[in-house]
Amino acid sequence: MKIIFLKREVKYIMNIKKTIIGNIPLLIWGEKKKKVYIAIHGNMSNKEDNVIKIFANIITKKDYQLISFDLPEHGERKDDTEYLCKAQNCVNDLNKVMNYAKRNYEEICIWACSMGAYFALLSYADEDIKKSIFLSPVVDMKVIIDNMMRWSNISEKELEEKKEIVTEFGQTLYFDYYSYVINHPIIKWNKNTSILYGSDDNMQEESIINNFSNKFNCDLTIYKGGEHFFHTKEQLAFYKEWLENIV
């Protein structure tokens, strides 16, 4: 498969290879290199999301390839109801992808968006990662689940008894997921990390992002008026310029 990018009448053709690790479909973007970025997408996204394509277009012109893959219940895996998109399953998948990268590359970096960043924090704290790039990251999943429980008037005891509850806004809460989050706090992240966060992000409070950035010495850029989902022409233009300055 090939994707053709057009810019100022100059064509850039990027080769994309499809492969699979167990039940995880992967895309490998660009010509063979010694360095690679692993991309972990966010909720309701997939391995070919527009923000991933933009990122791939930038880094494959440099010294990197990109590996992107579908999280459980996303992309090519959206119809698999046996293997759910829970933190423990995603950590398992991220570790498989990391092991693949270790076998094939000399240097590994990561790009992650939204809840994908949270899964990266859970999975890769002890890995040798040269650079981390986070777009609209979730860094405290417990706060998000607590908020959903409060909005739906669900207590921790009720969730424990019922094991899973479908909220009024369609999100299913799982006690084993919640327990995993509680038992695996983010206490270590000694990576060179750049974060792009929108000031109007309604998923993770700005104070939480600021505290995380200060605690782990991250380079934080706050885009005024930006949302959790970067999708407008202006937002994507800023995102692209930001990437070109940090990669």
Label each residue range with its predicted role.
Residues 110-112, 135:
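Short beta-strand immediately N-terminal to the catalytic nucleophile in serine-hydrolase-like folds
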